[in-house]
Amino acid sequence: MTIAERCHTTMRFLFIISVMLVLAAPLGAQDFAKGLQAFEAGDFAAAVKEWKPLAESGDSSAQNSMGNLYYNGQGVPQNNAEAFRWYRLSAQQGNVDGQGNLGWMFEYGLGVAQDFSRAAKWYKRAADQGDGWAQNSLGVLYYHGQGVQKDFGQAFHWYKLAAAQGQLYAHQNLGWMYEHGEFVDRNLLMAFMWYDHAANRGLTDAAEARDSIGTRLSYLEKLQVMGMSKLCMGNAYKDCGDAPRSRYSY
């Protein structure tokens, strides 16, 4: 696989506390919060005790949370099939995290037969709800032509949407596409900028790619990139535009 990567397995299953509290059903919000408090304290058995009844009663956030517990083997025996079952119940109710997680399970054949087309279907549903992780994952499927027709334009489109939300792997993937001129004109200034955003948040592959490009840029070009980068971050990654053509654009 090229540097255009999906995020590491564990990142999909990190709990986003604010989102989970907002999505919790009003009638079960207090119990959901108790489960979340127990989870954060490392008392996974107590989290199961609070979340499982909610999940069985149809709470989509609790269903997704039970899927996470089964996926990671926290408070319950690790069981991908059970994780898949809970994610599917959550996703079918329109829960964005459940949809993204279900896409992941289909993509990697976890608890279910691998099916890229179904992975794309569920990633698309989550992506359409604005989930940056799912947007990047859908972009990767388009990039590689897995479950969808290979389309660099669609890959770039979804990477851009994900990048606008600060999704660091999307930043890395945009860097790759600018470096290699895939769908967009090759532009090492833009590639350097996007790699730098990802590298500054800990992606070593992005750091290596950035540093390699850096050896080919002049001092003035590096200053230009710094200005572009500040503007991009100041716009919360939503309007980063294209850089002027560098000596290495064509």
Where are these regions (language model features)?
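Terminal, low-structured helical/coil segments at or just beyond the last alpha-helical repeat
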Residues: T204-Y250
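Hydrophobic face of amphipathic alpha-helices that form TPR/SEL1-like repeat modules
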Residues: D31-A38, P53-L54, S65-N72, V76, ...
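Short helix-capping/linker turns of helical repeat alpha-solenoids
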Residues: G42, E56-D59, N72-Q74, N79, ...
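N-terminal secretory signal peptides that target proteins for export/translocation
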Residues: M1-M11
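N-terminal leader/linker segments that initiate helical-solenoid repeat arrays
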Residues: L27-E50, S61, G241, Y250
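Bacterial N-terminal signal peptides
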Residues: L14-A24
